[in-house]
Amino acid sequence: MEFEFMTADTVLPPCMPLPTTMLRLPISNTAKVMYARLLDATLAEGTEDTNGILFVRFPIVELAAALSRSSVTVKRSLKELEDAGLILRVRRGVGEPNRIYTLLPKKEGCCDE
């Protein structure tokens, strides 16, 4: 991989969004990267539910491949995000991936420290 210095005119490569609030949360770095990936997927290819709220379907195996992590690690990180109130998983039928709603922190100081 080659690297170059940034200038004022440098065009950034594709990036994933990560709210700065996330940096202070007591969750693993894997969960933080997963949140950024889920938020990116929601913005890029989210599906609207009947209320107009965006969600994604991201099977565990695909999420594990996208993050280069094991399925066990992905499940643990999803639970971390759910416990922190950052995602909501809605279970579907047998063999169908869950709907994952990515929730946004309301403001910079919203989370317990």
Predicted feature residues:
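Short recognition helix of helix-turn-helix/winged-helix DNA-binding domains
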Residues: 1-61
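Winged helix-turn-helix DNA-binding recognition segment
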Residues: 42-104
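Short, amphipathic alpha-helical interaction segments positioned at domain boundaries
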Residues: 106-113
